[in-house]
Amino acid sequence: MRPSGRTAQQIRPVTITRNFTKHAEGSVLIEFGETKVLCNASVERGVPRFLKGKGQGWVTAEYSMLPRATHTRSAREASRGKQGGRTLEIQRLIGRSLRTCIDMSALGEHTITIDCDVIQADGGTRTASITGACVALVDALNWMRAQGMVKVNPLKEMVAAISVGILDGEPVSDLEYIEDSKADTDMNIVMTEAGKFIEIQGTAEGEAFSFDEMNSLVEMARHSIRELIDIQKQALA
């Protein structure tokens, strides 16, 4: 039995609140159970130097956790003068995931930056960030269309992500922190609406996992991501 009483395949209750803040072109609060992430999408004219004159846009992301998002306070990375390796890894993952779903030529020479700020962490912050950021990105693109900044919708398809793992010998989906800290295997999987993979991150924390167990986790993730994309679309309807 999982601590929450959920079945192995069951994800936590997911809530997506759009237009959460006033100023951002796309703003979403996403909640996976007790994990809460604010995803703000900001639109700017112009692109990084390496893209200037190419007629393409750019989508990038930044990720951070508020000092008291966890059980004990963590110092702000700004106070240490640099970002940690985990932060850099996660924000690169978010950026890669979002760029996959955008036609950069249709975006034109505009940059969209997604800021993912973890308000409260209870496992799965990077996957919640990707899932919420995609909805914020869609709202930002719709704003651009309304402003006449793009002629056609640059969105190719939705993207979502989920964590899966092996807990007490059983594959489970959408791990809470207490589960993640005890899991023998932990995976983060990002997929497109069409069912294609963007990223599979898998690590054996305790006991090594078999090929069959890996396939079980991937199949479980596919099912959960289909469910998440349905939730995204309902929020955008």
UniProtKB/Swiss-Prot annotation:
Binding site residues for phosphate: 86, 124-126
Keywords assigned by UniProt, alphabetized: Nucleotidyltransferase, RNA-binding, rRNA processing, Transferase, tRNA processing, tRNA-binding
UniProt xrefs under InterPro entries: ExoRNase_PH_dom1, ExoRNase_PH_dom2, ExoRNase_PH_dom2_sf, PNPase/RNase_PH_dom_sf, Ribosomal_Su5_D2-typ_SF, RNase_PH, RNase_PH_bac-type, RNase_PH_CS
Pfam families the UniProt entry points to: RNase_PH, RNase_PH_C
Record's keyword annotation contains rRNA-binding: no
Reaction(s) the record says it catalyses: tRNA(n+1) + phosphate = tRNA(n) + a ribonucleoside 5'-diphosphate
EC nos: 2.7.7.56
Gene3D superfamilies reported in the protein's UniProt record: GHMP Kinase, N-terminal domain
Family that this chain belongs to: Belongs to the RNase PH family.
PANTHER family cross-referenced by the UniProt entry: EXOSOME COMPLEX COMPONENT, EXOSOME COMPLEX COMPONENT RRP41
Function noted in UniProt: Phosphorolytic 3'-5' exoribonuclease that plays an important role in tRNA 3'-end maturation. Removes nucleotide residues following the 3'-CCA terminus of tRNAs; can also add nucleotides to the ends of RNA molecules by using nucleoside diphosphates as substrates, but this may not be physiologically important. Probably plays a role in initiation of 16S rRNA degradation (leading to ribosome degradation) during starvation.
Name of the molecule in the record: Ribonuclease PH
Taxon lineage: Bacteria, Pseudomonadati, Pseudomonadota, Gammaproteobacteria, Alteromonadales
Encoding gene per record: rph
